[in-house]
Amino acid sequence: MSIIFPTYSEKKALSKSKQKKFCIWQIVINCERKRMRKLALSDEILLSVDKAARYIGGEINSVMKNLDGIDVRVAFCFPDVYEIGMSNLGMMLLYNMFNKRPDVWCERVYSPWLDLDKLMREQNIPLFALESQDPVRDFDFLCITLGYEMCYTNVLQTLDLSQIPLKAADRDESCPIVIGGGACAYNPEPLAAFFDLFYIGEGETVYDALFDAYKANKEAGGSREEFLLKAAQIPGIYVPAFYDVTYKEDGTIASFAPNRPGVPEKVQKQLIVDMDKGYCPIEKPVVPFIKATQDRVTLEIQRGCIRGCRFCQAGMIYRPLRERDVEELKESARAMLKNSGHEEISLSSLSSSDYTHLEELVNFLIDEFKSAGVNISLPSLRIDAFALD
């Protein structure tokens, strides 16, 4: 299909919404010409949906790899729209970490908006990853981050659009391994029927062991079930099919026991002990084509919290408190702002004012980036932690 772009005078006569669609189309054309990339969606679809830049990939700092050297393909899904998912720090940390491995290619997947969802179902278009535009069903892993319970219906949408059977028991050797992780994975049972395995804990710790086990099983010609048995022996991995769970009348768990030999009786959460050694800092954050919900660089200064508020799930599951080295944070801030062009940096933690070197770090950022006009955001501040100076 050939597209004839309107002249300047013709474009002025168009409505603002149509002008925006033509601008988005020009972005798509430029991506194809410069990168020679195929796109999963046709010209007609991209012109008909809202914010088509959500679906084309090719952003600055997104990771492209040659499939010839790739042993493990990972589709990493945030089950919400692009603008929200692109603001998620946990997903960006793991995307960066996974792609450090030369044998792994991690690509991003987000939930389409209602207009595209409808068209994909009507035209039988499977859900695809942004980088390669390949169908999610062709990957080795589909990792879905579970940040909050309100996204659970989107998890089912993701599986359905990917043309992957909803229930783990109905999947065969051709289906990717579906992994659940994130804060809500600490209570996995509500979604247990839909996931092949859950990772309980902080993602940086044992994914390397999981990928290595998958590679070894693949090279040995092992089956899907053989891999899941090996995965279940990795600390922090919970395979629902290998456990029998019974419930009380009020819906709480009555008993929890493994039904396979070699499977641990309890699954213990995994965490980084030393944030300076186990942490994989982001140097080149992906810069979205359209404005994200949090349009800034995010710098994680510490993990965990000393406060222990009983209403706060994150304060409980991410214990204990672990701080990052202030000099490492300074270098990370320089790299992220230089490589992204963002004009704001957020110092992220559950209670930023409790970071030991906060004053030193803030003063450094003010002095270092004053001429560039970079703003500093301090979320999660407690009113009782302020000093007069």
Predicted features, each with a name:
Residues 76-77, 335-389:
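Conserved SAM/AdoMet-binding glycine-rich loop
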Residues 111-258:
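Glycine-rich beta-alpha loop elements in corrinoid/cobalamin-binding modules
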Residues 76-80, 98, 286-310, 337, ...:
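N-terminal pre-triad scaffold of radical SAM enzymes
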Residues 11-12, 20-21, 34:
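Polybasic, lysine-rich low-complexity intrinsically disordered segments
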Residues 35-51, 101:
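Helix-enriched interaction subdomains in cytosolic or periplasmic regions
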Residues 312-328:
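Iron-sulfur (Fe-S) cluster-binding segments and ferredoxin-like electron-carrier domains
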Residues 45-75, 82-83, 240, 246-298:
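N-terminal [4Fe-4S]-dependent radical SAM core
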